[in-house]
């Protein structure tokens, strides 16, 4: 008898191929797999420098700068000045330095997908121009994470609570619910940050109201926390008296 004819080498009709098993994964498993894959892939990609703000040099007028075509500016190569931060200059002509440009070091996937008030809504810079209306960021930021602990605890929590909610809602409604919770989290961040920025614009830098987010509009927001928190609340509503074993033992 050849080795291929032995019983334990024959394909079992009851065992689906790997691709079929993957297509049968739960939505929770898919979300966890995507978040982990994005985190790992992004971690192997090289850092990039993204210009986020400029500071005009003394004597330069923002109104005059805005009237100049941006193609006439040349940005010098940024130089690292602190962990995660680099600086360069905007030059007009051969040696007319008009502004100092601040850069933030980011991974490529994070740069494409992170959420911020400036990127999602609107921001105007005399040197860098207008940005905003990047609505995809309301979804993509949910699949990005800042570090290993961030992705680990979010995915572990989703693993414990996601199955219960998915079984109740079904796969499609569960995915919609999860993503909408993340979008709601981004909208709440946007409202609190927008109110803080608007308050300081109206009443001056001394304006302060507890609960508002006095962050720079370029501050990055990443993570699945809003969607995961929504899943936790749904699980608590569906099974308020359920016992959850932390790490399967406690």
Regions found by a protein language model. Give the residues of each.
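A detector for small-residue-rich transmembrane helices and their helix-helix packing motifs
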Residues: 2-250
């Amino acid at each position: 008898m050849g080795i291929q004819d032995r019983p334990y080498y024959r394909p079992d009709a009851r065992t689906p191929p790997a691709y079929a098993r993957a297509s049968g994964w739960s939505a929770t498993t898919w979300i966890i797999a995507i978040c982990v894959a994005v985190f790992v892939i992004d971690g192997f990609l090289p850092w990039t420098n993204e210009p986020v703000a400029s500071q005009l040099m003394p004597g330069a007028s923002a109104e005059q700068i805005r009237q100049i075509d941006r193609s006439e500016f040349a940005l010098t190569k940024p130089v690292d000045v602190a962990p995660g931060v680099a600086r360069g200059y905007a030059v007009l002509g051969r040696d007319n330095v008009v502004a100092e440009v601040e850069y933030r070091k980011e991974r490529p996937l994070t740069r494409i997908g992170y959420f911020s008030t400036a990127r999602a809504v609107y921001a105007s810079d005399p040197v860098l121009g207008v940005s905003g209306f990047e609505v995809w960021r309301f979804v993509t930021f949910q699949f990005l994470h800042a570090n290993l602990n961030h992705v680990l605890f979010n995915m572990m929590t989703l693993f414990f609570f996601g199955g219960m909610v998915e079984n109740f809602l079904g796969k499609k409604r569960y995915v919609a619910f999860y993503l909408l919770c993340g979008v709601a989290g981004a909208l709440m961040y946007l409202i609190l940050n927008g109110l803080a920025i608007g308050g300081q614009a109206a009443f001056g830098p001394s304006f302060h109201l507890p609960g508002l987010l006095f962050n720079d509009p370029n501050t990055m927001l990443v993570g699945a926390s809003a969607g995961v928190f929504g899943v936790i609340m749904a699980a608590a509503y569906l099974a308020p008296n359920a016992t959850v074993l932390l790490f399967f033992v406690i």
